[in-house]
Amino acid sequence: MSMSDTLADMLTRIRNAQRSRLMYVNVPSSRRREAILDVLVKEGFIHSFLIHEVRNGIKEINIKLKYSPKGESNIKEINRVSTPGKRVYLSIKKLRPYYNNMGIYIISTSKGIMSDREARKLGVGGEVICKVF
């Protein structure tokens, strides 16, 4: 059985792992997933991630999740916005801060995958992949 939305699968795995208070979660590797995880690390939502080869030519990403000193997860909400069936695009004019600048949109632009803050600085819009708070 093939998976139609691999990014939604990754976000769901992260959400479920944090609800279960796990320290690590594994997801299949792709360059797009790595770029999204780079943004999550830069913005402080996850601690780090490591790519390792499971079998010959098949790579997996091991994500180290981040929690507050009280044990609460840093990610309160992580949801897919643009899906394979319904793409959502925002121009720079319509790109507003998410959750009063406490959360971010992760956007795929012509200059790469980045947070909404970075996209506003560069003056570019694009496809809204997901929102994180």
Swiss-Prot record:
Annotated PROSITE patterns: RIBOSOMAL_S8
Gene Ontology CC terms, in alphabetical order: ribonucleoprotein complex; ribosome
Family, similarity comment: Belongs to the universal ribosomal protein uS8 family.
Keywords: Ribonucleoprotein, Ribosomal protein, RNA-binding, rRNA-binding
Molecular-function GO terms, alphabetical: rRNA binding; structural constituent of ribosome
HAMAP family found in the cross-reference section: Ribosomal_uS8_B
Keyword Cytoplasm: no
Domain of life: Bacteria
Regions annotated as coiled coil: none
Organism: Orientia tsutsugamushi (strain Boryong)
Entries under InterPro entries matching the protein: Ribosomal_uS8, Ribosomal_uS8_CS, Ribosomal_uS8_sf
Name of the protein: Small ribosomal subunit protein uS8
GO biological process, one term: translation
Upper taxonomic lineage: Bacteria, Pseudomonadati, Pseudomonadota, Alphaproteobacteria, Rickettsiales
Subunit structure: Part of the 30S ribosomal subunit. Contacts proteins S5 and S12.
Described purpose of this protein according to its UniProt entry: One of the primary rRNA binding proteins, it binds directly to 16S rRNA central domain where it helps coordinate assembly of the platform of the 30S subunit.
Keyword Ribonucleoprotein applies: yes
Pfam families registered for this protein in UniProt: Ribosomal_S8
